[in-house]
Amino acid sequence: MRNKLFALAAIATAFAMPVAHAQQKEFKNVGITLGSMGNPFFVSLAKGAEARAKQYNPNAKVIALSADYDLNKQFSQIDGFISAGSDLILVNAVDAKAIEPALTKAKKAGIVVVGVDVAANGADATVQTNNVQAGEIACQFIVEKLGGKGNVIIQNGPQVSAVIDRVNGCKTVFKKSPDIKVLSDDQDAKGSREGGLNVMQNHLTRFPKIDAVFAINDPQAIGTDLAARQLNRKNIIITSVDGAPDIETALKSDTQVQASASQDPYMIAVKAVEIGHDILNGKKPESAMTLLPSTLITRTNVKDYKGWQAPR
C-alpha cells in the first residue's frame, strides 16, 4: 500500500511539472514610440497595441509617445522605456538605419523590439502594410482611369521605408505604360496636408497640364485637392495611401480625390503585439517581416469600407 502511495505521488508530480514549464511570460510594461500622434493613423495604432496588450495582461502599463519625426527625441523615448523596465517596445522608426543603436541597447536590456509601419534596423521583427502593393494599386487606378496616357505626378514624402516602397510600387506600374509621362517624382510634401498644398501649388504653376497625382498619404492628397481648388484646376485624378477618416469624407464628397489604398493601423499593432508576445516566450516568427495586404478604397466601394474608427 505504501509503495502504491509513493507511485501515485510520483505520477501526480510528473503531471504537475509541465504546467509550471508551460506558464507564459506576460507583458507588464509596453512602450510605443510613433512618428506623430497628431496623425489619426498612429492614434489608431496605439489603441490597437493597448487593447491587445491588455488582453494578455489587464494590468499591463502601455505608454504611447509621439516622436514628432525627431530622431533624437525617439532615442530619448527608447532610453526612457529601457529605464522603465519595458518588456516590449513598438517603434515607428524616424530613420530605419539611424535608430539601430537605440534598438540594440534595448535588446541588450532584454526587451523585445518590434517595428511598426516602417522598417527598423535591429528590431526583432517588423509589421507593416505591403506598401509596394499599396503604391501599385493606387497608381494602377490612375493608369486605368487615364486609359494608359497622360501627365502624372508622384508626390513624394519623408524618406522612410513605407514611403519609398509606395513610390517604387507606383513607378513600377507607370513604367509599364509608355504614354504615361511622370512630370515629377522627387518633391517631399512632408506627409502633411500643408506640404501637399504647397508642393501642388508649385506643380500647378509649373505644369500647365496635370492629369493625375499620386500622393504618398491621405493628408498630402487632401492638401493637393485644396491647391487644385484654389487655382481652379479641374479634372485631376488624385489617389493616395492610408484609408484615413478624412479620405473617407473626401471620397463621399465633391473633391478630386478618387481612391486610397487602405491600411489598418489597429491590426498592424495587434499583430505586432502578438509577435512580440511570441518572441517574449521563445517563439520566433517565420519571417522577420510581416506584410498586411492593402485594399483600394474608391468612390464606388467607400460605403462598405470599415475604416480606422470602426468599432473593434
Task: Identify the role of each PLM range.
Residues 1-21:
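Gram-negative bacterial Sec-dependent N-terminal signal peptides
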Residues 2, 21-312:
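A residue-level marker of the well-folded mature domains of exported/periplasmic proteins
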